[in-house]
Regions:
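Sec-dependent bacterial lipoprotein signal peptides
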Residues: 1-28
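Conserved, well-structured interaction surfaces
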Residues: 56, 93-162, 197-207, 343-352, ...
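Hydrophobic-face positions in mid-chain alpha helices that act as interaction patches
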Residues: 237-356, 385-386, 401, 409, ...
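Inward-facing hydrophobic residues that define packing positions of alpha-helical scaffold repeats
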Residues: 59, 120-123, 188, 195, ...
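Membrane-proximal, proline-rich intrinsically disordered regions
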Residues: 30-80, 319, 388, 428-466
Length: 466
């Protein structure tokens, strides 16, 4: 018993000594051990971003943000079309494959949305900062401002091409209302303004001649002008019979761009391990196996269905002239959807062949079949494919040819779903009741934005397009 009492006393003394030691040390360490107001010496405070010396770094960060946003949202758009299909176990990929793109709770749409919103905000912020530097005469390299405008144009037109509605005026913790689906054309107007500023800087604004920036700006401006006209057709209450795009500005820009581009030119954003979205199209396709290139394009591996069969045997879609597996599709699949590609899928933003297809469509809209064939055949020549000759026998076959060539030449570039809507095409995987069919819907403002932004659509789980 005495031993037990002694041990208790010793324990009590030890605890008292420990408490005294902690009390003695606290003033030397901090007044409150739970105080979180400790400065991180590695943090960049916003005031530092007011230094013109950081302009290049700021623009590089914007480029990384835009690229990350694309990796996070491209799969949602592609699986909702016939470009990709669900092959895994996650139900929300299946609902997209079924044509239900309008669900704001979909985990993949909701997971990608914040990256797109971040890139939109950062583009506005970066362009404004560098414009201030340029006005003050302190911007060291005007190409940085041109690049910022190009990245901004990419994210703005991506929003216009992929989303039903969006919040454009929010500023960090300051909420704002969405602009409304009927007003989404302003995203393309913003992209046109940004690419125009980039062109002005490159051509007359004191930037040393930069042919690559000029190509990018011209090609992206053509895409933006074309995209605005396409959205107006695809999202009309009733898709008009005259469902071809003929925009004078897009045609002029495409023509000018082709004078600067080689026939094989493509401007790509290629992600790295440091700028991938948490759930990204590369990982879901080439690692996890949740999604795969669509069944109209490819044949699956006979033993592993979430992989494309090896080589040309993996290509299901035939070329209408050669009658054999499309080498255009084969090249596209090799660039995006093979295990060897991994997570870092290059994403084409503009290309010479897209410029040719814009010009081809404008000629077809004008009833100029010969001019249409000239441009389409030029785009096919990029892959050394033979020209169309006697295959075009009517306006209907010409239009079907246009849809086919856009389908294979612009694969996985965020163009397909609106083409499907305007041409009346449907994915075999779409359910008859799916809102992708019924409402020609695009990606909605998703759950997280609705939950955190009181001005966003409510209730936060309600479909606004059906």
């Amino acid at each position: 018993m005495r031993q037990m009492i002694s041990m208790r006393r010793l324990g009590s003394k030890s605890r008292l000594l420990g408490a005294a030691l902690v009390a003695a040390l606290l003033p030397a360490a901090c007044a409150n051990p739970f105080d979180t107001s400790v400065e991180n010496p590695n943090a960049v405070v916003e005031e530092a971003l007011g230094d013109p010396a950081g302009a290049t770094t700021l623009v590089n960060g914007l480029g990384a943000s835009v690229t990350r946003a694309l990796t996070g949202i491209a799969g949602v758009y592609a699986v909702s079309s016939d470009e990709m299909t669900w092959t895994g176990s996650r139900e929300y990929w299946k609902t997209l494959d079924d044509g239900d793109i309008a669900d704001p709770v979909n985990e993949y749409a909701d997971g990608g949305f914040p990256y797109v919103a971040e890139a939109r905000w950062l583009s506005d912020y970066t362009i404004a900062r560098l414009t201030e530097f340029n006005t003050a005469g302190t911007l060291r390299n005007k190409k940085d401002l041109a690049r910022a405008n190009i990245y901004g144009a990419i994210i703005y037109m991506t929003i216009g091409e992929m989303f039903d509605d969006f919040v454009l005026a929010s500023d960090r913790t300051v909420a704002a209302a969405p602009i409304g689906g009927a007003n989404m054309g302003v995203t393309f107007d913003s992209a046109v303004a940004m690419t125009t500023r980039a062109l002005t800087l490159v051509q007359t604004g004191g930037v040393a001649a930069d042919a690559e920036l000029e190509r990018q700006a011209l090609g992206l401006r053509a895409r933006a002008r074309y995209g605005k006209a396409l959205r107006a057709i695809a999202k009309a209450a009733t898709v008009p019979a005259a469902n071809l795009v003929s925009d004078a500005g897009a045609t002029a820009d495409a023509t000018a761009a082709l004078t600067k581009m080689t026939s094989t030119y493509a401007f790509k954003l290629t992600p790295t391990a440091n700028n991938l979205a948490g759930i990204n199209i590369g990982y879901e396709t080439n690692n996890r196996g949740e999604i795969r290139a669509g069944s109209t394009f490819v044949n699956p591996n006979p033993t592993v269905i979430y992989l494309v069969a090896d080589g040309i045997a993996g290509i299901k879609m035939n070329d209408p002239v050669t009658g054999v597996a499309s080498t255009t599709v084969s090249k596209a699949i090799d660039a995006c959807c093979r295990r060897t590609v991994g997570n870092n899928i290059p994403m084409i933003q503009t290309s010479a062949r897209e410029m040719m297809l814009i010009l081809a469509e404008a000629r077809l809209a004008a009833g100029d079949t010969a001019g249409f064939l000239t441009q389409v055949n030029a785009s096919r020549a990029v892959d050394a494919l033979p020209a169309y000759t006697t295959q075009i026998t009517s306006a209907a076959t010409a239009k079907a040819t246009l849809e086919y060539e856009r389908k294979v030449q612009l694969y996985l570039q965020g163009r397909r779903l609106m083409d499907m809507y305007r041409f009346g095409s449907a994915d075999a995987r779409w359910l008859a009741s799916g809102v992708g069919v019924r409402g020609r819907c695009l990606i909605p403002i998703t759950y997280t934005e609705r939950l955190t932004n009181p001005d966003a659509p409510q209730p936060n789980n309600e479909r606004k397009c059906s």
